[in-house]
Amino acid sequence: MSKSKLKSAQYSINELVKNIKGYSFASKADMRHMLNRCIKDLHEQGYKLGHLNGLKPKHIHTLVDLWKTQGKSTATIKNYMAKLRKVGVLLDKPQLVKSGNDNYQINRRSYVPTYNKAIHQTDFSNCSDPLIRLSLESQFLFGLRREESIKLIISEAWQGNCLRIQPSWTKGGIGRTLNITNEEQRQWLTKAIQQIPAGQSLIPKNKTYKQHLGHYQKQIKLMELSKCHGLRHAYAQRRYLELTQQFDSNGKGLTCPIDGGLSSRQLKGIEREWDRRAREIISRELGHSRIAITKIYLGC
């Protein structure tokens, strides 16, 4: 492996990622990590690229073949392909990666979960850091992603009956509006806005996002929570019941499949329509663009 060419290629990655508009800190870090892995893999395969501009379609095929032999999951391979397509756009090389993954014989991704990942019960008082506790509670109550819950500026986001999530706080730089739908959310906002000065996020003034993220990870470890994404799953599942209860004139609603309810295919008539409408709303509220993603949170 040519160290000088590898360093040069890594520098070109840093420069490219640094100048991407609309990407959050986490999205840029993820992009940088994955592109560096691609370049290292290519060097190990004998392609000593010194710059991202040197990427060609044959290199993409080489990477896909390598990932398959390494046993990488379909989801992981598709994630890499999405990053490489973005590189093609940024470098004005639209032919670098073909538009469809079928061209590379990549299997279709399955969104079917094997178990319920929701964290419905946890004692937030076990968190000794008040800012991190607020972040965790916001994930549970509003379905926020980790980065969103840390960068949240409550005084700016809370607009009466809704919470406006700014693009700069989100994955992919796409903002969204969340309606306040219950008293627990409103009580939390009232409590939180009294604790946090106007204009301040849930990051201490003397720390960067990266520094605070490290502290956050230590705190959730002490709470014996390995991954807090389950708080977001819990939000989606509560919201599914809440929405279908609103659609149901009897107020009974539906339990999502992953929590013991009927699958979408088993539902009949109007109940199937409730399921579709609820999934569309939840997909938007979670910051996703595809309804299929809700299978991860709700089952199918």
State the predicted function of each range.
Residues 163-168, 261-300:
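Short functional hotspots where side chains directly engage DNA or cofactors
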Residues 14-107:
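N-terminal core-binding DNA-recognition domain of tyrosine recombinases/integrases
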Residues 224-276, 288:
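Short basic/aromatic active-site micro-motif
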Residues 151-191:
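Conserved tyrosine-mediated DNA breakage-rejoining catalytic core shared by Y-recombinases
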Residues 100-131, 137-144, 152-155:
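Long, amphipathic, Lys/Arg-enriched alpha-helical "connector/arm" segment
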Residues 181-245:
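Active-site/catalytic core of tyrosine-dependent DNA strand-transfer enzymes
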Residues 54-58, 187-197, 294-300:
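C-terminal/domain-terminus segments
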Residues 138-151, 242-247, 286-289:
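A short, glycine-centered helix-capping/turn motif at helix boundaries
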